[in-house]
């Protein structure tokens, strides 16, 4: 089959986003032209990006390697021998006024935020970064980045780039200068401009910055007497729901058919009048193909693949080389599992019209079906850089990264899959599993707790969690996963318990099983298997019992006490007491000769048991004080005082350690927890000292909050403020700080642009409501973002709470009505 283009045609180049580039490619067979994308390196949004692209294709500038990943499409390389022959006509789309510069070059925001996904995925950090990356704020930006752990973990080149970015909101004059130079470079009779659409949000309002830009581009083009197409009128004729993706809610992407209609309007209204005669027969053919496509697409959506196939193959008998029909055949082949044929078809289509968003999706499905993981990942990443971010694309990206053992990518992609659809159980398992390749357990802990919050887990998730908790020595997650698996009488859990050597986890296992025995009925056969595990641990304790080696003695105590906790038989009890007395004697002897390092080594082994032994705790806590380990000394004293609150020596160690600790969140939690046991402090001087330390910690915490505000770390400031409510009686002082945090966040988020998702905005709003559940700003903010996520149930609750706080108002009443209507439609749709 010969599907290659013929030469000598009218040539057309589109410079802009996928909104114009993809439909121009699709239109080639129907408007008798050839799309010329030689040396076009990627999508553009601002007038300055378009001008930079034009200078590059004309050979006036080169793009340095260090900025190419943030300007060029992924996996695209150009040689210096590539030549862009001037096209007969150029369409220049200008859809943004947010100009991002580094090293004198315009960067593409989607490529930038994809490369630095982890950095920009945190709402507060993204907001603060964009607000500081403006002219005159460089010293503040560098100070902010210097203390950011995510930034610190980047490569030297990445840190340098983020440090050198400058953001500018272009005004009308700057845009006009770019447009004038574009016309000068391309020629007045060869160029036209195009704007974005002035679409409305779910709240029924336009995006003001977009409206201003559309008006500016229209006005400038009119002054220059250059054609300009504003698709807004066409969108209004079509209806926003038909014109824009996601039933009109995606304000960024056009449906294929609306994009095709825009190009048709450009040819009929602009190009046909100046440069190129249209073939009416070809346009009629396009209309026929559109009707066939609509019918087949509906049949596929209804699951009637037989009818869709019959109609398609009937159409192909008359239109064997039509790229739209061949692409539909690729879709059907993928549905049927004929991935080789699907891939061949879509490859043929791309030879005719080039790569578009929809051909990329066909290619993605066929490559995934063929298990060609590297190509599938490359295709998925190209789609993501084109802002095509849905569950299918991210799942293929994550699964391909898994297969290629690129686990850092796998982690980030599974995380994004679960943001879109938290109900996929296999996604949670894969997400958790991908964290095993990180050096620390932070990613593992984050993934586990996110999974727990989703409440959509299974035993496979818990088995993965148990294994990784051992790897990262995370005792709390270990206990959580173990308890769940033991309830289900998991054989996997027993296998794991028989092989662990971490004494902390051995002790945690004993606590877990002892607590379960009061609430959970297990079968006798399973209990016998658990008993065998503890017998083995008791035998380990016997083998390690040595009064000459404190570390071995501590290990023996951990195993013997664990066995005793669950099975307090006389034999096990006697042996445990023997080990405990020998351990305590050895501890006293070592303390007297100031052998602090060995005491510390043994104390770490039996740490969870020390709270049951106040005598041993006093020696260990004093050892920690002598070593300057104030936080550990304080923690040990506190956990023992919870069980034995009247030990004055431990009270003194705990309270006098506080002044040496600089971890403010730790101190707030400590003070709040100690408040519950101070009634047992029988020493007046200890009570007086505690009151003094309470005031001191509260004052230090407020200073910490203000410092974090100054640094722009509003999330940290808010977290501390929420905790501080537990110990600070003067709430008015805290409320002042809270209102300032809201003001600063509101200012910074305006510069966050499209880098921040509604999920993250909603999470932040919920956090604001933790501090003040009746704050009007936070309620409105949460409601709007819940609506953007189509969570109308949650949005309705926020609007109703806002109405209760502020009283009925017309805008809130209208939003409540919108939510109720949406919920009724959802209910009727399901029935």
From Swiss-Prot:
Record-level GO BP terms: capsule polysaccharide biosynthetic process
Associated pathway: Glycan metabolism; Vi-antigen biosynthesis; Capsule biogenesis; capsule polysaccharide biosynthesis
Function, in words: May be required for maturation of the Vi polysaccharide.
Name of the protein in its database record: Vi polysaccharide biosynthesis protein TviD
Organism encoding this protein: Salmonella typhi
Name of encoding gene: tviD
């Amino acid at each position: 089959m010969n599907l290659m283009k013929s030469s000598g045609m009218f040539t057309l180049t589109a410079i802009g986003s996928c909104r114009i580039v993809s439909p121009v490619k699709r239109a080639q067979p129907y408007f008798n032209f050839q799309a010329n994308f030689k040396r076009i390196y990627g999508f553009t949004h601002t007038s300055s990006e378009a001008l930079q692209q034009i200078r590059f294709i004309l050979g006036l500038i080169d793009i340095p390697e260090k900025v190419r990943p943030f300007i060029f499409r992924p996996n695209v390389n150009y040689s210096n021998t590539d030549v862009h022959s001037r096209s007969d006509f150029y369409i220049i789309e200008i859809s943004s006024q947010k100009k991002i510069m580094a090293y004198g070059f315009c960067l593409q925001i989607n490529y930038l935020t994809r490369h630095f996904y982890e950095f920009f995925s945190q709402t507060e950090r993204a907001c603060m970064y964009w607000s500081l990356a403006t002219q005159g704020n460089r010293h503040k930006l560098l100070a902010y980045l210097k203390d950011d752990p995510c930034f610190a973990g980047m490569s030297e080149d990445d840190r340098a780039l983020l440090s050198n970015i400058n953001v500018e909101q272009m005004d009308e004059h700057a845009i006009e200068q770019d447009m004038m130079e574009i016309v000068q470079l391309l020629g007045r009779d060869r160029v036209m401009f195009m704007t974005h659409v002035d679409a409305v949000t779910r709240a029924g309002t336009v995006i003001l910055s977009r409206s201003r830009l559309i008006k500016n581009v229209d006005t400038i083009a009119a002054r220059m007497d250059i054609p300009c197409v504003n698709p807004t009128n066409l969108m209004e004729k079509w209806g926003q729901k038909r014109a824009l993706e996601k039933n009109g809610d995606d304000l960024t992407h056009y449906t294929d058919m609306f994009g095709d209609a825009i190009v048709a309007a450009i040819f009929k209204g602009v190009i046909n009048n100046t440069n190129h005669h249209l073939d009416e027969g070809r346009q009629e053919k396009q209309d026929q193909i559109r009707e066939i496509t609509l019918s087949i697409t509906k049949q596929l959506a209804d699951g009637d693949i037989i009818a869709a196939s019959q109609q398609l193959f009937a159409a192909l008998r008359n239109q064997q080389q039509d790229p739209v029909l061949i692409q539909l055949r690729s879709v059907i082949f993928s549905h049927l599992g004929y991935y080789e044929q699907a891939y061949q078809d879509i490859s043929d289509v791309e030879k005719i019209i080039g790569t578009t968003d929809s051909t990329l999706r066909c290619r993605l499905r066929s490559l995934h079906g063929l298990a060609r993981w590297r190509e599938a990942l490359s295709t998925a990443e190209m789609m993501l850089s084109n802002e095509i971010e849905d569950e299918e694309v991210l799942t293929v990206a994550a699964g391909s990264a898994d297969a290629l053992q690129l686990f850092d990518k796998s982690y980030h992609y599974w995380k994004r899959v679960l943001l879109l659809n938290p109900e996929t159980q296999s996604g949670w398992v894969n997400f958790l599993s991908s964290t095993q390749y990180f050096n620390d357990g932070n990613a593992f802990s984050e993934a586990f707790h996110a999974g727990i919050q989703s409440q959509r887990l299974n035993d496979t998730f818990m088995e993965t969690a148990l294994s990784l908790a051992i790897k990262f020595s995370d005792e709390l997650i270990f206990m959580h996963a173990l308890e769940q698996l033991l309830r289900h009488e998991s054989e996997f859990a027993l296998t794991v318990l028989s092989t662990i050597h971490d004494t902390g986890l051995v002790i945690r296992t004993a606590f877990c099983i002892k607590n379960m025995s009061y609430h959970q009925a297990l079968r006798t056969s399973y209990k016998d298997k658990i008993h065998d595990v503890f017998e083995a641990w008791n035998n380990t304790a016997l083998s390690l019992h040595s009064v000459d080696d404190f570390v071995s003695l501590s290990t023996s105590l951990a195993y013997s006490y664990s066995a005793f906790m669950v099975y307090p038989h006389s034999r096990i009890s006697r042996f445990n007491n023997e080990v405990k007395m020998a351990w305590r004697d050895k501890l006293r002897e070592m303390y007297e000769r100031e052998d602090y390092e060995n005491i510390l080594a043994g104390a770490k082994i039996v740490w969870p048991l020390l709270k049951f032994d106040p005598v041993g705790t006093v020696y260990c806590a004093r050892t920690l004080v002598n070593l300057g380990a104030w936080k550990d000394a304080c923690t040990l004293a506190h956990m023992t005082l919870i069980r034995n609150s009247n030990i004055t020596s431990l009270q003194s160690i705990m309270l006098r350690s506080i002044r040496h600790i600089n971890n403010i969140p730790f101190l707030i939690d400590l003070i709040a927890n100690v408040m519950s046991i101070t009634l047992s402090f029988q020493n007046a001087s200890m009570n007086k000292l505690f009151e003094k330390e309470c005031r001191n910690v509260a004052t230090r915490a407020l200073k910490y909050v203000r410092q974090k505000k100054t640094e722009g770390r509003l999330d940290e400031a808010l977290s501390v403020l929420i905790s501080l409510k537990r110990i600070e009686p003067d709430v008015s002082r805290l409320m002042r700080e809270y209102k300032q945090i809201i003001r600063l966040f509101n200012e910074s988020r305006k510069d966050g642009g499209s880098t921040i998702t509604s999920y993250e905005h909603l999470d932040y709003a919920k956090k604001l409501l933790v501090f003040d559940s009746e704050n009007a700003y936070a309620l409105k903010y949460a409601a709007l973002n819940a609506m953007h996520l189509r969570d109308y149930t949650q949005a309705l609750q926020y609007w109703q709470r806002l109405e209760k706080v502020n009283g009925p108002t017309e805008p809130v009443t209208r939003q409540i009505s919108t939510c109720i209507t949406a919920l009724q439609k959802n209910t009727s749709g399901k029935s």
